[in-house]
């Protein structure tokens, strides 16, 4: 379900490599070769994908797209003592306790707080319906940080989760409407977000839809 975002991230790396194919270290020029492996957005396969990269004797890891798979692979990189740099993975657990994992993006506690303040100050929300994928570290973590910040601001949050590979969000959107929510917060993958937006429009739901960095 994170395939589209993962492809965008890889394309960005490939573009950067095409623009700057070499690096100078200690007065010597080295060619930079990219090795790409696919973890298929699976926490289980993330570990084998990480091991695959290590077997290729890579010098550094970039990624992965998706917090859950990054958390799953982090110990593998630490044990191999290979540095990893997260580009878009925002869950704090990825780098916590791991001296070999770094990141160039912001964290979910920051993102959740900013989004909650936006809902309160700009959208004038008093009640927010939060919807994310069940068992997804990114969705669940960010909804939790959002909820904490929102409640401190005096907002009420209704939180629900949908199963993986769900394609019908009608009942969830109906619940949001019946609960009297002012805003829907859905920090989901791109593929789910598209379905939620389309089905909300089809149901005539015109409340603001708030999303995250994905």
Residues of each region from the PLM?
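Short secondary-structure boundary segments
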Residues: 65, 89, 132, 188, ...
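Extracellular/periplasmic bilobed ligand-binding domains
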Residues: 77, 142-214
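A generic secondary-structure signal
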Residues: 19, 23, 52, 117-122, ...
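Loop/turn elements at helix/coil->beta-strand transitions in domains of secreted/extracellular proteins
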Residues: 29-33, 56-60, 79-84, 97-100, ...
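Beta-alpha junction/loop-to-helix N-cap segments that form part of ligand/metal-binding clefts
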Residues: 4-11, 19, 23-95, 104, ...
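An alpha-beta-alpha
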Residues: 101-164, 182-183
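Short, surface-exposed alpha-helical segments at coil->helix boundaries
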Residues: 3-14, 43, 113, 139-147
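Residue-level signal for short, function-critical loop segments
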Residues: 1, 40, 133-135
């Amino acid at each position: 379900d994170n395939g589209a975002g993962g492809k965008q991230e890889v394309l960005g790396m490939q573009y950067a490599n095409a623009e700057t194919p070499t690096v100078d270290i200690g007065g010597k020029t080295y060619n930079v070769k990219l090795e790409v492996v696919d973890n298929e957005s699976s926490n289980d396969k993330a570990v084998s994908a990480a091991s695959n990269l290590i077997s290729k004797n890579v010098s550094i890891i970039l990624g992965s797209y998706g917090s859950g798979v990054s958390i799953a692979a982090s110990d593998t990189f630490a044990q191999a003592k290979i540095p990893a740099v997260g580009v878009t993975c925002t869950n704090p657990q990825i780098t916590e306790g791991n001296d070999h994992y770094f990141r160039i993006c912001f964290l979910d506690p920051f993102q959740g707080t900013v989004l909650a303040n936006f809902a309160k100050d700009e959208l004038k929300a008093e009640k927010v319906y939060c919807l994310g994928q069940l068992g997804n570290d990114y969705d669940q973590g960010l909804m939790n940080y959002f909820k904490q910040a929102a409640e401190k601001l005096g907002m009420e949050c209704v939180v629900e989760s949908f199963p993986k590979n769900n394609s019908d969000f009608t009942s969830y959107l109906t619940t949001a409407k019946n609960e009297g929510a002012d805003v829907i917060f859905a920090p989901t993958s791109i593929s789910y977000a598209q379905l939620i937006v389309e089905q909300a429009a089809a149901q005539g739901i015109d409340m603001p839809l708030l999303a995250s960095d994905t």
